[in-house]
């Protein structure tokens, strides 16, 4: 019996399909106003906190007023986490960056 490599194309496709299934479930939960209970079910408190921190990282990177080191100190996040956020933001589609600018940086 051959075990499938965790890095095989078939496994990658399966994981991608599982991700898309979750995204569709989340979309449906918003339509039915069940998104908060669903996310509470699916994510641990630490995972929810990490997502909130990632939003703050992206927001501050878009704002561009703090260095990555200052951001690390402000948020208590690891420099590797901030660097990954920065690299992801650099490779994000222009439309997504523009949308994030509008949504995250709008005046409160």
UniProtKB/Swiss-Prot annotation:
Q: Which Pfam families match?
A: Trp_repressor
Q: Which InterPro entries match?
A: Trp_repress (IPR000831), Trp_repress_bac (IPR013335), Trp_repressor/repl_initiator (IPR010921), TrpR-like_sf (IPR038116)
Look up the record and give one Gene Ontology term from the biological process aspect. Answer: negative regulation of DNA-templated transcription
Please state where this protein is localized.
Answer: Cytoplasm
Q: Name one GO cellular component term.
A: cytoplasm
| Residue ranges the UniProt entry marks as DNA-binding | 68-91
User: At the top level of its lineage, which domain of life is listed?
Assistant: Bacteria
Name the principal localization, coarsely classed.
Answer: cytoplasm
Q: Which controlled-vocabulary keywords does the entry list?
A: Cytoplasm, DNA-binding, Repressor, Transcription, Transcription regulation
What Gene Ontology molecular-function terms does this entry list?
DNA-binding transcription factor activity; sequence-specific DNA binding
Similarity field = Belongs to the TrpR family.
- Assembly and interactions? Homodimer.
Cited function: This protein is an aporepressor. When complexed with L-tryptophan it binds the operator region of the trp operon (5'-ACTAGT-'3') and prevents the initiation of transcription. The complex also regulates trp repressor biosynthesis by binding to its regulatory region.
Q: Which PANTHER family does the UniProt entry name for this protein?
A: TRP OPERON REPRESSOR (PTHR38025:SF1)
Task: Provide the protein name.
Answer: Trp operon repressor
Q: Which gene encodes it?
A: trpR
């Amino acid at each position: 019996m051959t075990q499938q490599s965790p890095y095989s194309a078939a496994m990658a496709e399966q994981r991608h399909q599982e991700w898309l299934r979750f995204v569709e479930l989340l979309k449906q939960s918003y339509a039915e106003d069940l998104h908060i209970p669903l996310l509470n079910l699916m994510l641990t408190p630490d995972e929810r906190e990490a997502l909130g921190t990632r939003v703050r990282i992206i927001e501050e990177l878009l704002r561009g007023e703090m260095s990555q080191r200052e951001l690390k100190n402000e948020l208590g996040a690891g420099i590797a986490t901030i660097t990954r956020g920065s690299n992801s933001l650099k490779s994000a589609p222009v439309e997504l960056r523009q949308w994030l600018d509008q949504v995250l940086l709008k005046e409160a």
